Amino acid sequence: MIGDIARILLVANATSLGWGLRGEWGHWWGATVPGALCGMSLWLAYGRSGYGWQMMAYGALLAVSLSVGGIMSYGLLVGYATAEKGRGERSPTYGCLALFLTGGLWGFFAGVGLGLLTTGTEYKAGDLAMWAVLASAGALMGYAILVRGLDLHLTPPRSDAWAAFLGAAVSTTIFFALWSKDLVVVANSALGWIGFGSGFSLGAVIHREGDRRGLGFSTWKFMEHNVGFFGGLALAVPAALHNGGPQSLDIGSSWKWAILLFQWFMFYMVITNNLDHWTADTKWLSRRIYAALQMGLILSLIPFIYLARPFVREWSGGGSSLVFVSLVFLLNIIGTAKFIHGWGDLRSRVVATFWIQFALVCLLLLLV
């Protein structure tokens, strides 16, 4: 019983920590972090131990699935939900419902990714190509009907990418429910929607009440952690109910290289975001130093590939928990460092939350 609870809480807290860190970097590149932590923790919780390549593959695929929602805009919706001054006449109820929509769309495609990993249905390249075409067509039609035709705008003058995502979600559901008759993918996508959507809405309500009562912590950051917690919780449920645990993937040499290059690229993106902030916002770095550091980061790919060659050939996948903890530790360091110039009581509490949750994830790993 304790182990079952610990497994679900491991996924929920790992995704929560990832989403809190995602707030440091933002956008789709930041969203690769909670996706990676969610996927890896799902394998550690429900997969077979000693299969580190499987863990990292799940992390990479969930990172891609979750990151696509990063092009949607939701900052103004939080302002509506919290009744922030200057946000127009749209009500907090509107803001919460709109956050359930955008957050749900974010989680929907994460659920699709997890569903494809755990379903018993075998999909060939042609099947996935058919889905990609239908999803793209749905995105175009959704945007054309809702935005161009009906003139619906969630957050004017911000992007209306939500309409394209909604169209893609509808066509994706039709494909998997009616064409493939794959209820595993449909159920996972629905749970992803509910988890991430409710996490956004509930987090916004807590954010509003925290600001109203003058609580001494970052209610915005609490909202971000809340999104990841409920999203991870929702995605952990089908994995917990799936007999035999997650499906093992056939991982050859090309897969291994793709996984490692993804890890390099994820770290490259978040470090670059730190450098952008230190150059454009704080003016710590000159443009020449920024360019030199960027060149160094890009050239680091050469020794990375050289050092990874024996790793690809010889690593059997053992010590997967240590690999996971090491990656989370490094991400925590990078996230902590970004706003080191603005250190104060509030920032101290934000950083403390990262490290307390990191410690909790490590403890839960020992219990699963």
Pin down the residues of each PLM region:
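Alpha-helical transmembrane segments of secretory-pathway, organelle, and plasma-membrane proteins
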Residues: I2-V368
